[in-house]
Amino acid sequence: MGRSRSRSSSRSKHTKSSKHNKKRSRSRSRSRDKERVRKRSKSRESKRNRRRESRSRSRSTNTAVSRRERDRERASSPPDRIDIFGRTVSKRSSLDEKQKREEEEKKAEFERQRKIRQQEIEEKLIEEETARRVEELVAKRVEEELEKRKDEIEREVLRRVEEAKRIMEKQLLEELERQRQAELAAQKAREEEERAKREELERILEENNRKIAEAQAKLAEEQLRIVEEQRKIHEERMKLEQERQRQQKEEQKIILGKGKSRPKLSFSLKTQD
């Protein structure tokens, strides 16, 4: 068991050191590439400066030489001659020669400028080609490094994908929980509202029942009162009727002579043989 642990630890250390060495070598190669590109750009800049300096020196030497030549020609020129029009011949010829020299100098300057522009165009093309090749080389190096680190990159991508998936799942669960809580709160609010409405309806029903009961009680009392009044009226009528009958009997007694005021009358029926 101890040997296997030591071997695994040594292997892990070896892999870690190899990875560290690879990273170090990659960083060194990148720094070397950057240093090469920097040196090349510096050398190109120094070449450009040297060319500019040589051009300026050549211009100054050309102007000095042309001045010396003009001075020599003036010194070696014969005395002025006069033509039929009274003009000096030497001056006219010198003017023509001067114009020719100026034209030649202009042509030479134009050619020199054309060569300079051509050289600058070529230098620019060389710089662009160099930059393109450097870019291709860097892209190739990057591709090689990516190919070397393909498995590591794939593992890192998978790790990030899994991490993003976990985060999304967590966010989704949290969102579902929030929705569930919101639905529960809404359901509770609805139930509370329904309960309040139900209680209000029950209260209204109780109030209506109470009012109906009170109305029924009042109606029953009123009916009892009416019945009692009707009974009293009936009793009063009965009493009045009895009193009337009594008075009528008394009057009849008086009329008929009852109470020994008149003799009794006897009525008999004769039977026929």
Curated annotation (Swiss-Prot):
Residues 1-29, 37-58 have a biased composition (Basic residues). GO terms for cellular component: chromosome; cytosol; mitochondrion; nuclear speck; nucleoplasm. One of its GO terms (molecular function) is transcription coactivator activity. Residues 1-74 are annotated as: Necessary and sufficient for RNA binding. Residues 75-273 are annotated as: Necessary and sufficient for transcriptional regulation. The modification Phosphothreonine is found at residue 61. Its main location: nucleus. InterPro entries: ARGLU1. The modification Phosphoserine is found at residues 58, 60, 76-77, 266. The keyword Phosphoprotein applies. Induction: Post-transcriptionally regulated by autoregulatory feedback loop. ARGLU1 protein binds ARGLU1 pre-mRNA and stimulates alternative splicing to produce two alternative RNA molecules. The first includes an additional exon between exons 2 and 3 and is rapidly degraded by nonsense mediated decay. The second, a stable intronic sequence RNA (sisRNA), retains the entirety of intron 2 and is able to bind ARGLU1 protein preventing it from stimulating alternative splicing. Residues 1-113, 238-273 are annotated as: Disordered. A motif (LXXLL motif 2, degenerate) lies at residues 201-205. Residues 93-253 form a coiled coil. Residues 66-84, 93-113, 238-253 have a biased composition (Basic and acidic residues). The keyword Coiled coil applies. Disulfide bonds: none annotated. It comes from the Eukaryota. It is found in: Nucleus; Nucleus speckle; Chromosome. Interacts with MED1; the interaction is direct. Interacts with PUF60, U2AF2 and JMJD6; may interact with other proteins involved in RNA processing and splicing. Belongs to the ARGLU1 family. The N-terminal region can bind RNA; preferentially binds 5'-CGG[AG]GG-3' motifs. This is Arginine and glutamate-rich protein 1. The lineage of its organism: Eukaryota, Metazoa, Chordata, Craniata, Vertebrata. The gene is ARGLU1.
